Amino acid sequence: MTSPTGVTANTEHVTVQSPDTGIAASGFTVPHEGSYQTKESRITIRLNDAVSIHAVVREPIGASGARPACLFLHGAGTGDSSEVYGDVASAMASAGIVTLVPDKRLDNYSTLHRDYPQMAEDYGRSFDTLKHWPGVDAQKTGLYAESEGTWISSIITANRKDVAFSILTSAPVVSGRQQMTMAASTYFTDSGAPRSLINDVPKLTSMDFRALGLEYANFDSTPYLSKLTQPVLVNYGTGDLSMPIAQGAQTILNQTASAGNSNVTVRYYPANHQMRTGSHLSRPGLPLESSYTRNLEDWINSVTMGATASDWSTPMIAGAQPSQRYSAPTSVSPGLISSLGVLLTLLGLALGASVLCGLCAAGVGINSRIRSRGRRSQQEESGRLPGFGQGIAAPLTLLVSLSTLSLLATLWYVGSSAVQALSLHHASVAFSGVWTVLRVAAIILVLLFGWLCSSVIAGIGHANRSSAQIRQDIRIAHGSGHQAVVLLG
């Protein structure tokens, strides 16, 4: 079913088989969280001749034998190895799993440019470092990725056959453009934004962003997921409005099934995008969902001991029941304006034209006053009016002023609506009413423009006609102009 927003209501529903997120395999006894004391080592990893990064290794103290290991991949909002994943990586280490959290390479990473294949190569260097770390079993080394990092991990698992397992948490699955269309529509709807504003979301997100860079917005990990042949654990927070929590999991299940991989476990937690509780937003200091790390560790220890799809004594899909309002569209089409660069250019031209018209209005008014002083007596004797410019300056100035204010107010409103949507604040009735005021103002501007055009048309070429004739023509033109505006509207 197509929703009023232009995106499609989600129909790929996932039904959990149990509310219990616990993970266990029959016949396998695994070390649990807290079984070991841990230690940290800060190391440097050389990515190439010019770039090196820092990393943090956490490992269990006194664990016997070669241990399973896990490399962590950053999401979009993190980069420093000392500031992220500390609680998750430490918990894993206490369950006997060696972990490595590297810095994100930032010299080739920005808001406008991201090269995911290159990032996969860089993480591959860290993966090799972890595989050869003392006490690590190279055959039991896998990946943990969140959000944007899951796009990168999907490239790694497609290109390398030595990845023992893959954990995908808060995975977008679809391209960034498609994910943003779904997320923005959901955010705006939940914040109470006007319906007409929500309808324009897909038109904006589907624009050509090449004027700003942003080519990575089109990266789609779906083809890589069909090469996921190792055990996979998929995690989503049911409070995460930014991700396709049902559609994403179903897509992963479909893609792995096409590769003959049935060892895919899915868990849903009452948590946000970062698997934390206390707020739907990603805020510092929020606690992890209480069972999250324990389930991660039990799953890793089980699959690295050889657990297959038939060995699980717990359901493959479990946890809180997910609810995804809109589907991430498989394709998006822009409106009349297909390029963000063109849109920004038109906005700039509109503001520039307003300023130019304002200067013209001022010039017409000043020139008219100067000329009228010398010809006033002659015009009064002949009963004639000057043609172009008579009475135009004031309405032209008003039109320019209102147009500029209306454009700026609209940009402010859209920006404010986006801020409220992203902060999950519901718009007040008064704020929502501003949109109605802006729409009424737009109608008034169209009428004023029609009136102004009719005045100009009636005045051009009639400088030698009498005052009474001019006024009669203007009345006729005004009526025709208003009728045209109504018909066009």
Residue ranges, per PLM feature:
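Membrane-interface motif at the C-terminal end of an N-terminal transmembrane signal
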Residues: 1-9, 488-489
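Soluble extramembrane regions of membrane proteins in the secretory/endomembrane system
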Residues: 6-312
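Juxtamembrane amphipathic/hinge helix adjacent to a transmembrane helix
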Residues: 294-336
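Extended non-globular C-terminal regions
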Residues: 320-489
